[in-house]
A protein has these predicted regions:
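Short C-terminal tail/terminal secondary-structure segment
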Residues: 1-3, 149, 228-229, 240-254
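Conserved glycine-rich cofactor-binding loop
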Residues: 10, 17-18, 41
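Short, small/polar-rich loop/turn modules that mediate ligand/substrate recognition or access, typified
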Residues: 90, 176, 181, 239-241
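Substrate-binding pocket helix/loop in short-chain dehydrogenase/reductase
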Residues: 100-101, 105-113, 205, 209
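Active-site helix of classical SDR
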Residues: 124, 160, 168
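Alpha-helical segment proximal to the catalytic Tyr-Lys
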Residues: 129, 173-177, 237
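Residue(s) in the substrate-gating loop at a strand-loop-helix junction
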Residues: 144
Length: 254
């Protein structure tokens, strides 16, 4: 199991104070890494830190606005100052506004791209400078099954998540010789605050997803933990530029 041991590593998870981000932070921490949680809501940050510390995970948090380059740069630098280095970056911060294309205001549409895609560029660019100091690193970008499909009432979301996959491939191609592996995870329908609202808006969604998904159920945030540990560990040293669906088989069911 040493192949998956993250002892002595430092991981930063944006949007790490709930849902998929918190589940990944927990799994990475349980594998031995020290964890930095970043999010806009300081109360949620603090509660998440308390949870991880109760599991004997070394953890701190920072407030960040991932749509602001200076805030992202400060976050990365502060994480390094806190623990002396950075080895793993999980770009998980995300948002959505569900509307028909003609109903969006341009600023709403741009705000989704800024949060879901541009923030990954900004944080990864800064992290690269610190990864070079420790001989490499791991970047995990959180896409979506809607990286592969066009989401109804989600043109900005689908565009941003499709961009995540191509950004991941480009980073991987560029930074491979720097010993930096960059991969994407594409969650399916996971039971989070975001998807709970979707089920309110679309009452038939619950049953529809369960019927189409070979696993026969919605995912739990903890279902993402194993993939996060794999992509953070030495076990994935020869894996880069991939986009791994974690969706109970939804995406193979055409």
């Amino acid at each position: 199991m040493k192949l998956f041991d993250l002892s002595g590593k430092v991981a930063l998870v944006t949007g790490g104070n709930g849902g998929i981000g918190l589940a990944m932070a927990k799994a990475i921490g349980e594998a031995g890494a020290s964890v930095v949680i970043a999010g806009r809501n300081n109360d949620k940050n603090k509660k998440s830190v308390e949870l991880l510390k109760s599991l004997n995970i070394e953890c701190i948090s920072h407030i960040v606005d991932v749509t602001d380059e200076n805030s992202c740069n400060s976050l990365i630098d502060n994480a390094v100052n806190d623990f002396g280095k950075l080895n793993i970056l999980v770009n998980n911060a995300g948002t959505n506004i569900r509307k028909r294309p003609e109903e969006y205001e341009l600023e709403e549409w741009k705000s989704i791209i800024d949060t879901n895609l541009i923030s990954m560029f900004t944080c990864s660019k800064r992290a690269f400078l610190h990864f070079k100091n420790v001989g490499g690193g791991k970047i995990i970008n959180i896409g979506s099954m809607h990286s592969l499909f066009g989401a109804p009432l989600g043109s900005a979301y689908s565009a941003s998540k499709g961009g995540v996959v191509q950004l991941t491939k480009s980073f991987a191609n560029t930074w491979a010789r720097d010993n930096i592996q960059v991969n994407a995870v594409l969650p399916g329908y996971i039971d989070t605050t975001l998807t709970r609202q979707a089920r309110v808006d679309i009452p038939e969604l619950q049953k529809r997803v369960e019927e189409r998904t070979p696993a026969g159920r919605w995912g739990d945030p903890d279902d993402l933990g194993g993939t996060a540990v794999f992509l953070s560990s030495n076990a994935s040293d020869y894996v880069t530029g991939t986009a791994i669906p974690v969706d109970g088989g939804y995406s193979i069911n055409g």
